[in-house]
From Swiss-Prot:
The gene is rpoB. It comes from the Bacteria. HAMAP family: RNApol_bact_RpoB (MF_01321). This is DNA-directed RNA polymerase subunit beta. One of its GO terms (cellular component) is DNA-directed RNA polymerase complex. One of its GO terms (biological process) is DNA-templated transcription. Residues 1161-1175 have a biased composition (Basic and acidic residues). It catalyses: RNA(n) + a ribonucleoside 5'-triphosphate = RNA(n+1) + diphosphate. Keywords: DNA-directed RNA polymerase, Nucleotidyltransferase, Transcription, Transferase. DNA-dependent RNA polymerase catalyzes the transcription of DNA into RNA using the four ribonucleoside triphosphates as substrates.
């Protein structure tokens, strides 16, 4: 037997074909969300407060200090928040200290700081009752970047940019004449020496002393002449910079100094963040810059006078390591004191080394380092600016290297915690201005922290972020895999990121640093391709937000691949050589072969085993979770694998899902970490178990109660239904499954079913990827899913009186009310069809002026039916089903409702949707198709043992698409079915061809794994042998019931008077210009005329046509289309005298838009209202207003 048995949880064993021994388990798959939020609660929030506070008033007599904060218990539980449309949030209380510096009086007070949304254990937030996810953002890391560009004459120029986390950019660039310029915050450029002079190093000799002699520096000094002898060079430079930054304002050296300090050297205005300081120190560090250069001076220990390195020595890694302590100490450190007019007058410490130029050995080049400021220094220092300039000047001498901005060492992740901290900081900064004013205006004696703090800006910033930020998204809840994928998504879009239109090809492309960090497969098709990515299965964030991936360390001394795990970021990995996970190893852990396949920077090639530093942990570390669920991924073309990974996320949860016969072993972990299952929190013994709750007694005697969710509506309108797995007496351990979630079976992800599939054509019904299906799959509910739709009706106070929910609906027979209770609300369990009343509701109607006789009759008979109109909630088109639940919210019960709403009724309708023609099906290899025909079981082709085939796919869908994995899955699936086993074939480490054929033979199948099939209609065998097997097929969320749409009379757009578009608006079909050309080409003038008039926007014509049709009269001639009238009016509005004449040269009167005519036409933008209107009123309401 090929393969070995592996247990997945307590309920499933699979035969695995993996050969690689994995030394590291997968991390928790949603830790990117949960860890980040926990960091925010523990340290991030405190840092934000400490950044903004203390706040002093303008006279500096009062100061508000931050002491601490604490979160109290959330107001609602998770379930209550869902039911009440509330947010799951906890109140935060902050303690402040108000110090009066004149009297020394201190007031300490705890201030309520609003409700802060709390992340659930599943990594989601509940905002206004809906489950949301904050997607992590992929942004350019703060730091210093160098680039090169070739001009039109083929000359190479260099540029550099310092990008802070917040603050102004500082850029350097060279021009065609070899002069170096700087730009401050994207303004006009000035010679870079001007900035150096402003920093207090004004003499030409001083500048040459700092940077060393070079053509670039000399050219720039020549360009930068002393224009105004009455000013010192520093003052003149400062004025010149001020003129660039604030053109047109009176320039003085003092104002320029304060401006520059604010722009770059004030930590409140300019923030590199910890990551920016780390990147700058790393890039400008002299150790990396000296590597492999030839030193041009003796390096002497300043204390002992000992020569450490002699001139002419090549600075190899070993040489640098030998003097590392000296470099980190005081070796070649020089102190420069700026002149008294400088922006910053503190002494500047630089570290300088002289090396030979790689381009000209006779030339000496100076390398200036920033002497590595402390990590706590978040603003720029003059040393940073001078060291950046030095690196920039060195580039043209061939020292240093330019940066690749798509390298994952230069892109980092802003996860939830950081995004929230940034929003909170924005809110606090707004609050700060407010506080400062109040502190200055009010009387110091009576002030308390409570009085001067207004929390509205803070709560508004947080609310706005959760409610409307591009990164706060409604959770994709089609199935557990889509939830998990959504939580691990990395988006380059969003505030501070890229935009779709500006993102070029390079940003979207796969980069070698994605290996083990970002999945090269899972990304959307279409405009977002490559901008939205997914974290690879082992990916993990370090404290700076760079993605790390794990490797096994190789002991270079013994050549043994150890089990020690090292996590590397992309730029750390660049220094090493990494071998693939499938490198063959001996028993003692050394490489079995002298030459191994490996990677170093961007090169995939063979390396000598002795030069390898690390080995991949697992073959699946390259890909994301969804991709790792595709068996035989290595045999699929990547374009189709992308579709396969994306389509698994669109699978609809079925009534009775089955885990795949051929899996990858990833199904268990994905289901476990998705948050959709009920997982045991502690060890214990099950003492009670039913469909809705499970009780587990812990060893210490305490009781854990687990609630099992039944048929809750998910965000996608599917049934979120959990099924209990354990029974009384079972022993459970922490982390075991207590209940399966939707799309799970026995603790494994189960998105679809295992039908018997044949690759064959049948009467042309599987042309163009169509799928032919057996009626068995319909009758036995194999692909049946439950969908829940929510409808709501609210009663408000109107000018004419309150709306009422009642059974007394005017002009409706008893038949329509049979399922309503005495309040007029539908009973649970009722079967409803389109147009049935769900909630009877009446709205007061304005009294018309009645005649005296009518008023008399009213007074006598009290006929109230005239005074109200029926605004009941009815079942919309396509909404029929069974009422699953009704929820009623009223003020009397203490429910929070919007202002003006007295009562809210929600009705949930469940639909059982069987698979039907027009539904979309797919395999896991990107092989998708639409069901084209459902054939009776007796007519389906059958196997020699009489088993009818379930699905027929077109064999032409395989060769050109190059997704051969589906055929291998088909054969292995058949063998698994015959043997009664489940199989795991992990990606890049799965069943080989031999394993496949061995298993096929073991299952007693023919040696080519094909079969003779018999035609179910005639009983004759088909001419050729057919590939038949078991393939995992899923039903996708694109169902024909949601897409089928037909319009009768419906709403029209306000301006053009043309029908709206789209199913949601009950719109019409667009007849565009190309369709018009087609009719013109056929000369179908009458058809064309009625399409352009009656059926579109001839307002009077369509009313008359409607009337004529209902009365059986001939249809009158059409009039002028509304859009033509709009065109005429628009031309007139431009001042053109535009008139329309008939054939007798008489002017045609174009009707004017009357006031009050838009009662029941609608504006294209009011789509939401359109939906409500469609739900509440029958389709006939939007006849046009002319008939009144």
């Amino acid at each position: 037997m090929a393969g070995h048995e592996v247990r997945y949880g307590k309920h499933r064993t699979r035969r695995s074909f993996s050969r690689i021994n994995e030394v590291l388990d997968l991390p928790n798959l949603i830790e990117i969300q949960t860890d980040s939020f926990q960091d925010f609660l523990d340290t991030g929030l405190r840092e934000v407060f400490e950044d903004v506070l203390p706040i002093s008033n303008f006279t500096d007599t009062m100061e508000l200090e931050f002491v601490g904060y604490e979160f109290k218990e959330p107001k609602y539980t998770l379930e209550e928040a869902r039911i009440h449309d509330a947010s799951y949030s906890a109140p935060i209380f902050v303690t402040f200290r108000l110090v009066n510096k004149e009297t020394g009086e201190i007031k300490t007070q705890e201030v309520f700081f609003g409700d802060f949304p709390i992340m659930t254990e599943m990594g989601t937030f509940i905002i206004n009752g809906g489950e949301r996810i904050i997607v992590s953002q992929l942004v350019r890391s703060p730091g210093v970047y160098f680039n090169d560009k070739v001009d039109k004459n083929g000359k190479v120029g260099y540029g550099s940019t310092v990008i802070p986390n917040r603050g102004a950019w500082l850029e350097l660039e060279t021009d065609a004449k070899d002069i170096a310029y700087t730009r401050i915050d994207r303004t006009r450029k000035i010679p870079f020496t001007t900035l150096v002079r402003a920093l207090g190093f004004s003499g030409d000799d001083e500048i040459l002393d700092i940077f060393g002699d070079s053509e670039l520096v000399r050219n720039t000094i020549e360009k930068d002449i002393h224009k105004n002898p009455s000013d010192s060079r520093t003052d003149e430079a400062l004025k010149e910079i001020y003129e660039r930054l604030r053109p047109g304002e009176p320039k003085t050296a003092d104002s320029s100094r304060s401006l520059l300090i604010a722009r770059f050297f004030d930590a409140r205005r300019y923030d590199l963040a910890a990551v920016g300081r780390y990147k700058i120190n790393k890039k400008l560090n002299v150790k990396t810059r000296l590597l492999n250069q030839i030193i041009a001076e003796n390096l002497v220990d300043s204390e002992t006078g000992e020569i450490l390195v002699e001139a002419g020595t090549e600075m190899t890694r070993d040489v640098i390591e030998s003097i590392e302590a000296h470099i980190d100490g005081d070796l070649n450190k020089f102190v420069y004191t700026p002149n008294d007019y400088a922006v910053v007058t503190e002494p500047v410490v630089l570290q300088k080394f002289k090396v030979q130029s790689p381009l000209d050995p006779d030339k000496v080049v100076t390398i200036v380092g920033n002497a590595t400021p402390d990590d706590k220094v978040r603003a720029l220092t003059p040393a940073d600016i001078l060291a950046e300039m030095s690196y920039f000047l060195n580039l043209s001498e061939g020292i240093g290297k330019v940066d690749d901005i798509d390298h994952l060492g230069n892109r980092r992740i802003r996860a939830v915690g950081e995004l929230l901290a940034n929003q909170f900081r924005i809110g606090l900064a707004r609050m700060e201005r407010n506080v400062r004013e109040r502190m200055s205006v009010q009387d110091n004696d009576v002030l308390t922290p409570q009085q001067i703090i207004n929390i509205r800006p803070v709560t508004a910033a947080v609310k706005e972020f959760f409610g409307s930020s591009q990164l706060s998204q409604f959770m994709d809840q089609h199935n557990p895999l889509s939830e998990l994928s959504h939580k691990r998504r990395l988006s380059a879009l969003g505030p501070g990121g890229l935009t779709r239109d500006r993102a070029g090809y390079e940003v979207r492309d796969v980069h070698y640093t994605h290996y083990g960090r970002m999945c090269p497969i899972e990304t959307p098709e279409g405009p977002n391709i490559g901008l939205i990515n997914n974290l690879s299965s082992f990916g993990h964030l370090n404290k700076y937000g760079f993605i790390q991936t794990p490797y096994r360390k190789v002991d270079r001394a013994t050549g043994v691949v150890t089990n020690e795990i090292v996590w590397l970021t992309a730029d750390e990995e660049d220094e090493f050589t990494v071998a693939q996970a499938n490198s063959k190893l001996n028993e003692d852990g050394t490489f079995a072969e002298e030459i191994v396949m490996g990677r170093h920077q961007g090169n995939n090639q063979e390396f000598a085993a002795s030069t390898v530093d690390f080995v991949d942990v697992s073959p699946k570390q390259v890909v994301a979770v969804a991709t790792a669920c595709i068996p035989f991924l290595e045999n699929d073309d990547s374009n189709r694998a992308l579709m396969g990974a994306n389509m698994q996320r669109q699978a609809v949860p079925l009534i009775d899902p089955k885990a795949p016969f051929v899996g990858t072993g990833m199904e268990y972990q994905a289901a476990h970490d998705s948050g959709a299952a009920v997982i045991a929190q502690h060890d214990g013994k099950v003492v009670f178990s039913d469909a809705e709750k499970v009780e587990v007694r812990r060893e210490d005697g305490s009781l854990d109660v687990y609630h099992v969710t039944k048929f809750r509506r998910s965000n996608s309108g599917t049934a979120y239904n959990q099924r209990t797995l354990v029974k009384v007496g079972d022993i459970v351990e922490k982390g075991d499954f207590i209940a399966d979630g939707p799309s799970m079976e026995k603790g494994e992800m189960a998105l679809g079913q295992n039908p018997v599939v044949a690759y064959m054509t049948w009467e042309g019904y599987n042309f163009e990827d169509a799928v032919i299906m057996s009626e068995r799959l319909v009758k036995e509910d194999v692909y049946t899913s439950v969908h829940l739709e929510e409808f709501e009706s609210e009663t408000r106070d109107t000018k004419l009186g309150p709306e009422e929910i009642t059974r007394e609906v005017p002009n409706v027979g008893e038949e329509a009310l049979r399922d309503l209770d005495e309040m007029g609300i539908i009973r649970i369990g009722a079967e409803v069809k389109e147009g049935d009343i769900l909630v009877g509701k009446v709205t007061p109607k304005g009294e018309k002026d009645l005649s005296a006789e009518e008023r008399l009759l009213h007074a006598i008979f009290g006929d109230k039916s005239r005074e109200v109109r029926d605004t009941s909630l009815r079942v919309p088109h396509g909404g029929d089903g069974i009422v699953r639940d009704v929820k009623i919210f009223t003020r009397a019960n203490g429910d929070e409702l919007q202002s003006g709403v007295n009562m809210l009724v929600r009705v949930y309708i469940a639909q059982k949707r069987k698979i039907k023609v027009g539904d979309k099906m797919a395999g896991r290899h990107g092989n998708k198709g639409v069901v084209s025909r459902i054939v009776p079981v007796e007519d389906m082709p059958y196997l020699p043992d009489g088993t009818p085939v379930d699905i027929m796919l077109n064999p032409l869908g395989v060769p050109s698409r190059m997704n051969i994995g589906q055929v291998m899955e088909l054969h292995l699936g058949m063998a698994a079915r015959n043997l009664g086993i489940h199989i795991a074939t992990p990606v890049f480490d799965g069943a080989t061809a031999e394993d496949l054929w061995d298993t096929v033979a073991e299952a007693g199948m023919d040696s080519d794994a094909k079969t003779i099939l018999y035609d179910g209609r005639t009983g004759e065998p088909f001419d050729n042998r057919v590939s038949v097997g078991v393939m995992y097929m899923i039903k996708l969320h694109h169902m024909v019931d949601d897409k089928l749409h037909a319009r009768s009379v419906g709403p029209y757009s306000l301006v053009t008077q043309q029908p709206l578009g789209g199913k949601a608006q009950f719109g019409g079909q667009r007849f565009g210009e190309m369709e018009v050309w087609a009719l013109e080409a056929y000369g179908a003038s009458n058809v064309l005329q009625e399409i352009l008039t009656y059926k579109s926007d001839d307002v009077t014509g369509r009313l008359k046509a409607y009337e004529a049709i209902t009365k059986g009269k001939p249809i009158p001639k059409p009039g002028v289309p509304e859009s033509f009238r709009v065109l005429v009016k628009e031309l007139q509005s431009l001042g053109l005298d535009m008139r329309v004449l008939d054939e007798d040269d008489n002017e045609v009167e174009l009707r004017d838009l009357d006031e009050g005519e838009d009662d029941d036409v609608m504006h294209v933008d009011d789509l939401e209202k359109a939906r409500e209107k469609q739900a509440q009123e029958t389709p006939e309401v939007s006849e046009n207003s002319e008939e009144k």
